[in-house]
A protein has these predicted regions:
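Inter-Walker segment of RecA-like/P-loop motor cores
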Residues: 51-53, 58-59, 64-98
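Metal-dependent nuclease catalytic cores that hydrolyze phosphodiester bonds in DNA/RNA
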Residues: 385-611
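Conserved helicase motor core of SF1/SF2 NTP-dependent helicases
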Residues: 4-7, 17-46, 51-59, 78-80, ...
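Metal-dependent nuclease catalytic regions and adjoining charged, substrate-binding loops involved
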Residues: 309, 564, 591-592, 599-604, ...
Length: 704
């Protein structure tokens, strides 16, 4: 273990003296080292660290074991709640229930002397109230260390508030949970991660102030301005150069505001690299967490949110231009201030940082908040500028005019349930609990692998492929036709003649008949690759033997014993993968427009697309291959049912079946309840959160 720096030792000394400490720490400043050194220097204190990030928890736990530290335990909010309150607390919904019911601990809480609240800039009211409950249930006063970086608060739209860090002393003032009422403010300004050149870029170009200090020299920050097509080629070429020089794929991040979108630059770069047998990983959804096994040994394409708390040697930031505000941060009122997401993205690299600015249209321009222009970059010693510099830029008048026209929002159940604000979840959770009942409890669990190892030694997540292949095999045995093959064929129709030749070749070589689960898993992978326009799983999964014949027999028997009951008689109705609404069909949205109009601006319209897993004469089924039925699954079914009612369709039962566990959840509802939930979800996504004033915040968030 390295000796603590002066900044870090000051934090530890204040803790030794019995004070509470609030510490603002820049990216890469050694918060984890400070935590470990505190544990080492205070062996007589029992310490609990609560952190936001499960991957960080795992990393620190490994270091605790390595250094033989026995007086510290590491938890996330969820793991702590699971340990002492309920197995259901692995989700926010479970924690919310514990607070609502004031659930008593299921075992005695071990006494602690010092509680370290890490990454507290991303604390929300839910987590804050859980910490208070936990400490009260423990029953003895403690000392606290509150750590974080207000500029790394990324989840404000979900209810996170950096004031839990910046106003911590006022929040906790007078609390009987504390041994001492004395608070000391410290800071960790020295970043041991980024280079001097990156530090200068952050300080001088992004913030115009001495935000952070650095202590190692490196190469200049590479700033590239070019067309989208040329940037794609440049990134691929540069990554190949790095790999040829000995850099490993696992040492490269490619970050963007979003990795979604069929024509996104991120996907084109990934496909170009995978075509050259370079291992890559792209999350299926922008909100997916990065699994350590799955990303191991690969170039990772990710959002800024998913990369938080991580670092790699080389980082490419795609879309480092004003399109960020136009496309991904429309609700930010002040474009003259650096968003936290871009600060996080620019502080993930340890060796090389590449910033990519698009120069495709006359209105493309640099980020408004930058304190330096292209010509300033050329003159500086910490930036290598590539491209044609400009100093005069056109205003996007067409975009300004468009603001007064009809603003259509294209939604699907999957998109609607991502990044739901805590305030919305607090409102809808009691309603959802009333709507759903367990009509069939968990029975024998079928062991279906969710992550598999390939011949190349990589790991791939296959839960999405299982969820497509197993129901498809069941449908085909009912209908005696290959539904999945038809879905693949229909998806290919949308592709242009000269694109995705690799996928077209794969489809051409596929057998029309599927005889085993292996065939269905391969076909599911092909279908997913076509839908997402991503090649990596198709290229990197080399065997499809992770589900045995016995397992698939068990799955089919379970499906037949549950769904087959509704398919008795002659010519039973069974419509798998059934489209109930499409965003392009205006007449389907007439009633929806009427119902939503009172809740949203006059020029805002919503257009929905939704596909249900299985429609029978009696029910609409959502089929899952997962560990448990979650809040997200229930919300999807709520949205399906609401759309179904808006279309004035005949009444049906809405059910969720977990194929792995056999659990069935049924929804009983009134249409007004569904509308309340859908409106709340849409408002949470498209309306700005009204932040409380500091006085209101302190009034409501007090530890007293």
């Amino acid at each position: 273990m390295n000796q603590p720096s002066e900044e870090q030792q000051l934090v530890i000394d204040n803790l030794k003296n019995g004070y509470n400490v609030v510490c603002s720490a820049v990216a890469g400043s050694g918060k984890s080292s400070t935590v470990l050194s505190t544990s080492k220097q205070m062996p007589d204190r029992q310490i609990l660290q609560i952190t936001y990030n499960s991957s960080l928890r795992l990393e620190i736990k490994e270091k605790v074991k390595y250094f033989g530290l026995e007086n510290i335990s590491i938890h996330t909010f969820h793991s702590l709640a699971v340990k002492y309150y309920s197995p259901d607390c692995h989700t926010d919904t479970g924690i919310r229930r514990v607070l609502l019911n004031d659930t008593k601990p299921r075992s005695e809480i071990l006494k602690i002397d010092l509680c370290m609240l890490d990454e507290f800039q991303d604390c929300s009211e839910l987590y804050f109230r859980f910490v208070l409950k936990f400490l009260r249930d423990m029953g003895s006063p403690i000392q606290i260390l509150i750590l974080g970086d207000p500029l790394q608060c990324l989840y404000g739209f979900k209810g996170a508030d950096s004031r839990f860090l910046t106003m911590a002393d006022q929040i906790w003032k007078g609390s009987d949970l504390l041994k001492s009422q004395t608070f000391v403010h410290c800071s960790l300004k020295m970043s041991y991660r980024i280079t001097d050149q990156m530090g200068k870029f952050v300080n001088e170009a992004m913030f115009g102030s001495q935000l952070m200090l650095t202590c190692k020299s490196g190469e200049p920050v590479t700033y590239i301005r070019n067309s989208r097509h040329n940037i794609e080629k440049t990134v691929v070429y540069t990554i190949k150069e790095l790999l040829d020089s000995g850099v490993k794929p696992s040492e490269i991040f490619v970050l963007a505001a979003s990795v979604k979108g069929l024509n996104s630059n991120v996907r084109k770069m990934e496909n170009a690299l995978v075509d050259q047998n370079i291992p890559c990983h792209v999350p299926m959804f922008d909100t997916d967490k990065l699994d350590e096994r799955v990303i191991g040994g690969k170039i990772v394409f990710s959002t800024f949110h998913c990369a938080k708390g991580r670092q790699r040697k080389y980082v490419f930031v795609i879309g480092f231009d004003n399109n960020y505000f136009n496309q991904f941060a429309r609700t930010l009122d002040d474009t003259s201030q650096c968003p936290n997401t871009l600060y996080v993205g620019c502080t993930r690299a340890t060796h090389g940082l590449y910033l990519l600015e698009f120069d495709q249209y006359p209105t493309d321009r640099p980020l408004d908040f930058l304190k330096m222009g292209h010509h300033d970059f050329i003159k500086s010693d910490f930036v290598k500028f590539k491209g044609i510099p400009r100093s005069i830029f056109y205003q996007d008048e067409a975009g300004d005019k468009a603001k007064s026209l009809i603003d259509k929002k294209y939604e699907s159940p999957t998109k609607m349930i991502k990044f739901i604000p805590d305030s919305v979840l607090d409102y809808i959770s009691p309603i959802i609990d009333r709507l759903f009942t367990i009509s069939s409890p968990i029975s024998n669990t079928i062991d279906i692998p969710m992550i598999v190892e390939t011949k190349g030694g990589f790991f791939e997540s296959v839960s999405d492929l299982n969820g497509i292949a197993i129901p498809s095999l069941y449908y085909d045995r009912l209908n005696r036709e290959n539904l999945l093959y038809k879905m693949v064929e229909n998806s290919m129709i949308e592709m242009k003649e000269n694109e995705h030749m690799y996928l077209k070749r794969i489809v051409k070589e596929m057998p029309v008949q599927c005889e085993s689960i292996k065939d269905y898993l391969l076909l599911a992978n092909v279908y997913t690759a076509i839908q997402e326009r991503l090649y990596f799983k198709l290229k990197q999964i080399d065997e499809y033997d992770w589900i045995s014949e016995q397992v698939i027999t068990d799955c089919l028997e379970r499906l037949d014993s549950i769904i087959g009951i509704e398919l008795k008689g002659e010519n039973p109705q069974v419509l798998p993968e059934h489209v109930i609404i499409h965003h392009s069909i205006e007449e389907q949205h007439a009633k929806i427009d009427q119902v939503l109009a009172p809740h949203f601006p006059d020029n805002m319209r919503f257009r929905f697309s939704a596909v249900v897993d299985l429609l029978t004469e009696a029910s609409i089924w959502e089929l899952k291959c997962t560990g448990d039925i979650s809040m997200d699954h229930k919300l999807q079914v709520i949205i399906y049912a609401w759309i179904w009612d808006m279309l004035d369709k005949p009444a049906k039962n809405f059910k969720i079946l977990n194929i792995i566990t056999g659990e069935i959840v049924t929804m009983n509802y009134e249409p007004e309840e569904l509308t309340r939930i859908v409106v709340a979800l849409l408002k949470g996504k498209y309306e700005n959160i009204n932040l409380k004033t500091d006085d209101e915040f302190l009034r409501d968030m007090t530890a007293v």
